[in-house]
């Protein structure tokens, strides 16, 4: 049997980028051969084995045949007569359909095996499908979009965009399970330029099917004095790229993505103003989270940011009482980490505008100082002192927090 490293490891080597892991394909072997060599079987859908020493995954070379819609609708053939080229031709993109032989020590040996022009497309910075079999797996649309967020100087070949459009028109993306859609979107959000992912999804029409709430933001105007970029979709893309450049978590980037969804449903006669869009954004993002089964931490932060980002932006004008109410609405005293993340999303929102990319965000330091002051109030001691009149506990705790925040704001003003 012959072992080859395939896919991303070869692509990244040619690009001079580190590769986190390798995919291995074994040609000319049966499952019995693999087990006899000490490999442990782990694959459910097709034969995959763990190396006895490194525990890396090795898959038998295989071909695929489409049997139903969706990404699970495949039958696999994994016999010793399947060649390396048979295996490579089923892969998504030419840049992922290259291989190199691997010796007994796990080292890459020999030339790059490139039957489909992957090196040519790497040089041209282009994503191109290997064959029409690309159309059999709708996850590949999401993967191409995600790769665009990682390799953001690449473009999608026109014929590949056209094929992706045909897949969308045929309803293939509608058959994707929500968990897989979220998984790919989440991975793309964590890349260097997540906006590129959504640009590619729009380009082929997939965004309108997967996230219509986001897709409808393009073409919706905002006030040019606040948003020189005007277009709401453009603004949101600037915000998520800013959040990525800040090195934020997935929850922050998702909150940045969905914070303005309500602007897509603003009545035309009030444009470019968007009064009440915060409430509409919360309703829409909750629908998105339910549909895609978004994790609770991402959903909860997104709700806080969508509902309160306008107040957080205006908080430099707020006194102690208004700031304390804001902290309490955000549950900042019980969840200070989430509140700090909300401030990061709001900072990205402010800087994600044409001409404002390098702005500072003094609201963040002021609100964190206010939170520190409010947290210094001993609510337990107040409750103990009012044990005979518990109805006043919440009011007195709130008053004490306002006083503490007021004192801290005066200190900041003096400095």
UniProtKB/Swiss-Prot annotation:
Catalysed conversion reaction: a tRNA precursor + 2 CTP + ATP = a tRNA with a 3' CCA end + 3 diphosphate; a tRNA with a 3' CCA end + 2 CTP + ATP = a tRNA with a 3' CCACCA end + 3 diphosphate
Segments forming domain HD: 232-333
Cofactor note: Magnesium is required for nucleotidyltransferase activity.
GO molecular function annotations of the record: ATP binding; CCA tRNA nucleotidyltransferase activity; cyclic-nucleotide phosphodiesterase activity; magnesium ion binding; phosphatase activity; tRNA binding
Subunit structure: Monomer. Can also form homodimers and oligomers.
Entry EC no(s): 2.7.7.72, 3.1.3.-, 3.1.4.-
PANTHER family: MULTIFUNCTIONAL CCA PROTEIN
Annotated positions binding CTP: 8, 11, 91, 143, 146
Keywords: ATP-binding, Hydrolase, Magnesium, Metal-binding, Multifunctional enzyme, Nickel, Nucleotide-binding, Nucleotidyltransferase, RNA repair, RNA-binding, Transferase, tRNA processing
Protein name (Swiss-Prot/TrEMBL): Multifunctional CCA protein
Note: A single active site specifically recognizes both ATP and CTP and is responsible for their addition.
Binding site residues for ATP: 8, 11, 91, 143, 146
Protein function: Catalyzes the addition and repair of the essential 3'-terminal CCA sequence in tRNAs without using a nucleic acid template. Adds these three nucleotides in the order of C, C, and A to the tRNA nucleotide-73, using CTP and ATP as substrates and producing inorganic pyrophosphate. tRNA 3'-terminal CCA addition is required both for tRNA processing and repair. Also involved in tRNA surveillance by mediating tandem CCA addition to generate a CCACCA at the 3' terminus of unstable tRNAs. While stable tRNAs receive only 3'-terminal CCA, unstable tRNAs are marked with CCACCA and rapidly degraded.
Domain of life: Bacteria
Family from the record: Belongs to the tRNA nucleotidyltransferase/poly(A) polymerase family. Bacterial CCA-adding enzyme type 1 subfamily.
Cofactor (UniProt): Mg(2+); Ni(2+)
HAMAP family in the record: CCA_bact_type1
Residues binding Mg(2+), per UniProt: 21, 23
SS bond partners: none
NCBIfam families, sorted: PRK10885.1 (NF008137)
Domain notes: Comprises two domains: an N-terminal domain containing the nucleotidyltransferase activity and a C-terminal HD domain associated with both phosphodiesterase and phosphatase activities.
PROSITE patterns referenced in this protein's UniProt entry, alphabetically: HD (PS51831)
GO BP term (any one): RNA repair
């Amino acid at each position: 049997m012959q072992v080859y490293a395939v896919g991303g490891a070869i692509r990244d080597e040619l690009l001079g980028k580190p590769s986190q892991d390798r995919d291995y394909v074994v040609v000319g072997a049966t499952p019995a051969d693999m087990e006899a060599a000490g490999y442990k079987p782990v694959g459910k859908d097709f034969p995959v084995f763990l190396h006895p020493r490194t525990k890396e995954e090795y898959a038998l070379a295989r071909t695929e045949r489409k049997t139903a819609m969706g990404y699970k609708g495949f039958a696999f053939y994994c016999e010793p007569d399947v060649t390396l080229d048979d295996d490579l031709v089923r892969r998504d993109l030419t840049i992922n359909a290259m291989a190199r032989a691997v010796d007994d020590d796990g080292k890459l040996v020999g030339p790059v095996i490139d039957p489909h022009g992957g090196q040519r497309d790497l040089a041209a910075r282009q994503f191109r499908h290997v064959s029409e079999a690309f159309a059999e797996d709708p996850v590949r649309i999401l993967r191409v979009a995600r790769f665009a967020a990682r390799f953001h100087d690449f473009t999608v070949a026109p014929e590949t965009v056209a094929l992706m459009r045909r897949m969308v028109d045929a309803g293939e993306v509608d058959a994707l399970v929500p968990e897989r859609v979220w998984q790919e979107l989440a991975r793309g959000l964590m890349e260097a330029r997540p906006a590129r992912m959504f640009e590619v999804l729009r380009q082929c029409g997939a965004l309108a099917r997967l996230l219509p709430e986001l897709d409808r933001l393009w073409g919706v105007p905002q006030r040019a004095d606040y948003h020189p970029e005007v277009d709401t979709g453009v603004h949101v893309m600037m915000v998520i790229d800013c959040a990525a450049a800040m090195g934020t978590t997935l929850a922050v980037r998702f909150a940045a993505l969905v914070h303005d969804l309500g602007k897509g449903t603003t009545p035309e006669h009030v444009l470019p103003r968007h009064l009440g869009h915060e409430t509409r954004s919360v309703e829409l993002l909750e629908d998105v989270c339910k549909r895609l089964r978004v994790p609770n931490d991402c959903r909860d932060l997104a709700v806080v940011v969508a509902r309160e980002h306008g107040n957080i932006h205006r908080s430099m004008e707020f006194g102690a009482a208004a700031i304390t109410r804001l902290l309490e609405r955000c549950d900042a005293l019980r969840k200070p980490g989430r509140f700090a993340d909300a401030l990061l999303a709001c900072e990205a929102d402010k800087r994600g505008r044409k001409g404002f990319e390098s702005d500072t965000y003094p609201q963040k330091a002021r609100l964190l100082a206010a939170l520190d002051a409010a947290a210094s109030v001993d609510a337990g001691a107040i409750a103990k002192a009012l044990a005979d009149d518990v109805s006043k506990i919440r009011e007195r705790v709130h008053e004490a927090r306002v006083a503490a925040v007021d004192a801290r704001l005066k200190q900041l003003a003096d400095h």
